[in-house]
Structures are given as C-alpha cells and as structure tokens.
Amino acid sequence: AARNHKNVFCEKPIALSYADCDEMVNTCKENNVVFMAGHVMNFFHGVRLAKKFIQEGRIGKVLYAHSARNGWEEPQPSISWKKIRSKSGGHLYHHIHELDCIQFIMGPATRVTMTGGNVAHSGPEFGDEDDMLFLNLEFGNNTYAIVEYGSAFHWPEHYVLIQGTKGAIRIDMCNVGMTVKLADGTEEHYCVHANKEIDDDRTRIYHSTEMDGAIQYGHPGKKPPMWLNSIMNAEMEFFNGVMHGDPIPDEFKPLMTGEAARAAIATADAATLSLRENRKVSVEEVMK
C-alpha cells in the first residue's frame, strides 16, 4: 500500500519482528505516507490525562512504572489464533498496549530481562503461548518498569501504575478509574474512559464474564463493549481528521509514523530473546 502511495492504518501488533516493522516504517517514510498503528490505549481519557499531568510535573520525575494484565483462562470451544505464538506472538505481542503505553511515558527501554513460561495451559486443548510473563525494563537513566502478562492468574489484575518523585498515578482497568496521589497524601479521582457510565460498564464486564477481562478477546459478530467502542470511535475520528488535513498533536506524532509501534516490538523481541537465552538483553541487539 505504501509503495502505491496509500496511507496506512495497521492494527497491533503491526508485525511480529523488529525487521518487519523496520521495513514497514521505512517504506512509509520513503513514500511520504501516514502509517498509523492501532495502539488504541493512547486514546483512553485517563492515559491522555496522565501524560498531561506528567508533562506538567504534577508527580515529579517518573522513576518507575508497573503494569499488569492478567487473569485466568479455561479451555475454549476452539483454540483461537491468538493462542498460537506463530500467529499472534502470544500475550507479549497481542497485548502490547501496556508496554507501548509505558514507553510513550518513559521512552524506549534500553535493556530487558524476561522470565516466565507456560505454567498451567499445556495440552491439546490449549495453544502454545506462554501463560505467565514478567518483563523487567531498564531505561538507561536510573528508571525502571515491570510489565506482567498472562492467563495463569486466578486473581485478575489490569492496571498501569506510574511512580514519580512527587506522587503517583494509577490507571485501573479492572475496578475502572484513575487515581492521582500527591506527595501530601491527597488523592484525585478521574475517569479512565469518556465518562463514569462507561467506566462502570467495563468494571461490570471484568467481574461477570466467562473469561477475565484482561485476557478476553472478541469474536466475529460479537458487539464491542461500550469502553472499546468509545475509544475505537475516538481513534477512527482522529485518523479520519488527519486524512483530511488536521494537524497531528505532539503526543500522537510517534503513533502516526509507526515509530512507537516499532519501538514496542523491538522491546518485545529483546524480551523474547532474554527468555530464550536466559540473560539480560540490550534492545539495540535486535535492531542491528
């Protein structure tokens, strides 16, 4: 498409290897077309607000982030393509939103260590993806992050926690809401999505579905929930605006060249190499 001078929208993960991502990004640059990655978490009201507060210095310098996206999965009637690593990359790639969100806030990771494996979902009724993964990210400036993924957790969690020198921000996507805690102990509360009705509906889904909300996935013909519908509409409205000449705000510029998506895949590839070779990996290793 890019070689034929067509603008591109690509869902996440944009590819399952850094080399493929790099070719996609460079081809779009060479042909001067937009390359938007579908990293829809950037359109959460709470995520945008958190970025704004961080830029304003409300929680000071960001020191550490911790995300968790995990739950428990029972055998399904059929094995989804998302459970086959060769097709989806497993949790690390098809749930790459939280990793992307953290790197949008803290910059690209420089070194990665990943541990985990398939601890509870082996057998013919399951795919071959790892069901428990822990990423330890280093950013080269004495700042760090932990990212958890998996479907082997009976206590489901889904959040991004950002710790700074003057406060902290927690974006909770299970008991849905955003909390800003300042150094004097005061707390401020905000919606994660466009309004409280949508937040409450997502909370209900997390506590009532057959599959924990952090790991559930859609099916053809299944209507998207309110929260997903609202952010998809925001994402497509933004993309349509850009296609018709609207300026791109600074916060979204890396999203519109594929560079942020490429950086997330680079970190994911480094994490995969770390797990396979049981060592700490510099992200630049996979970028050569």
List PLM regions with ranges.
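Structural detector of well-ordered beta-strand residues that form the stable sheet scaffold
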Residues: 9, 34-36, 66, 113, ...
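Predominantly a Rossmann-like dinucleotide-binding segment in NAD(P)-dependent oxidoreductases
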Residues: 34, 41-127, 278
